Amino acid sequence: MCETMDFFERYKNLKEKYEEKKTKPKVIVVGRSNVGKSTFVRLMTGRKDIRVGKKPGVTLKINEYDMGEYILVDMPGFGYMAGLPKKVQEKIKDEIVHYIEEHADEIAAAVQIIDTKSFFEIVERWKGRGEIPIDLEMFDFITDLKISPILVANKMDKIKKEEWDAVLDGICEYLKCQPPWHQWKFIVPAILKEGKGIEEIKKKILERVRLFKKLRGIE
């Protein structure tokens, strides 16, 4: 949650723990299926061979891309995936959690992408079943590990422009971050299919990567 996100202190601790380790930082990309992760990775890497589709569950394995200063890690989508048994979906989710836990000390930032249009409906549906909404669970998991988040509120074109602030403030409330959303520098509204928001995301990634490297003594 927002009140516990002391990432600067975490970076200082990592410098001592990894004084001799000179690996590139990782930046992970997480999100439910069909929120725009593959589109984001294509924009970041410039690769045309990354599959993008309307059906959930296009990415089913962990993929790593060397971005020069850091490694971009594209995680499979979690939650509903078309054509996959629930048991397989749970296995994929477990693999995501295991990877993040195992590599937490190497991760400079986590880019979590959400579908802004469906976010509220899905959260309320899960809460109505007495379950923790998966988007909120992932955000809590990331921040509990003291990994610096970048929350990409994608598909903002589905929201009326005059409602953007109210919608983003509402997301803050679900994340237990006091509105207004502008004060939280980790939130980026985006329309990834049009490339909107990508430059701001790149900027935030590099800020976190360079701070991470500086405090760990990595050239």
UniProtKB/Swiss-Prot annotation:
GO-annotated biological processes: cell division
Source superkingdom: Archaea
Key words, A-Z: Cell cycle, Cell division, GTP-binding, Magnesium, Metal-binding, Nucleotide-binding, Septation
Residues reported to bind GTP: 31-38, 57-61, 74-77, 154-157, 189-191
Alphabetized InterPro entries for the sequence: G_ENGB_dom, GTP-bd, GTP-bd_ribosome_bio_YsxC, P-loop_NTPase
Cofactor field: Mg(2+)
PANTHER family in the record: ENGB-TYPE G DOMAIN-CONTAINING PROTEIN (PTHR11649:SF13), MSS1/TRME-RELATED GTP-BINDING PROTEIN (PTHR11649)
Protein name: Probable GTP-binding protein EngB
Organism expressing this protein natively: Methanocaldococcus jannaschii (strain ATCC 43067 / DSM 2661 / JAL-1 / JCM 10045 / NBRC 100440) (Methanococcus jannaschii)
